[in-house]
Amino acid sequence: MVLKVKMGDIGVGKSPDSIETLLGSCVAIILYDRGKKIGGLAHIMLPKSRESDSKSPGKYADTAVPELLERLVKLGARRDKLVAKIAGGAAMFKANTNSIDVGKKNIDASKDELKKVGLRVSSEDTGGESGRTVVLSLKDGNVTIRKGNEVKNI
């Protein structure tokens, strides 16, 4: 089964399923426990939450990371065995050099939030100017990135 994660949402699952999302300036925060074959993906839209929006923890880097961790541990993942990867953060709307680069801010915030919980990004496919499709295979933890005709694994 393929679980499709929408903007601002979080998806978790077990082998043999996969988790997929489409990204522009948003970032996918991906965590995977290779031994248990359990993983998850948060599709964050913005770096920092506002207290008034506590109903959407997957929308922001600062709330998505702890929520994703909690859901994975409840599913049986071992926190000390989780591998972190990120993808996305494209500069989709580069009008001028003074424009706010939401993609870059999302990348930086994702790394910062993972670091706060003791996780280091093991690999990434971030930045650029085009969107991408991200697929996490829960069988083996491979993350496949598709950008146009280009396909690669991280």
UniProtKB/Swiss-Prot annotation:
Q: Could you name the domain of life of the organism this protein comes from? A: Archaea
Query: Per its UniProt record, what PANTHER family does this chain match?
Result: CHEMORECEPTOR GLUTAMINE DEAMIDASE CHED-RELATED
What this protein is reported to do is described as: Probably deamidates glutamine residues to glutamate on methyl-accepting chemotaxis receptors (MCPs), playing an important role in chemotaxis.
Q: What is its EC number?
A: 3.5.1.44
Q: Which reaction does it catalyse?
A: L-glutaminyl-[protein] + H2O = L-glutamyl-[protein] + NH4(+)
Q: Which InterPro entries match?
A: CheD-like_sf, Chemorcpt_Glu_NH3ase_CheD, Cytotoxic_necrot_fac-like_cat
Pfam name, any one: CheD
Supply the HAMAP family for this chain.
CheD
Q: Which family does it belong to?
A: Belongs to the CheD family.
Write the record's keywords in alphabetical order, separated by commas: Chemotaxis, Hydrolase
GO aspect biological process, one term: chemotaxis
From the Swiss-Prot or TrEMBL record, give the protein name. Answer: Probable chemoreceptor glutamine deamidase CheD
Q: Which organism is it from?
A: Methanococcus vannielii (strain ATCC 35089 / DSM 1224 / JCM 13029 / OCM 148 / SB)
A GO molecular-function annotation: protein-glutamine glutaminase activity
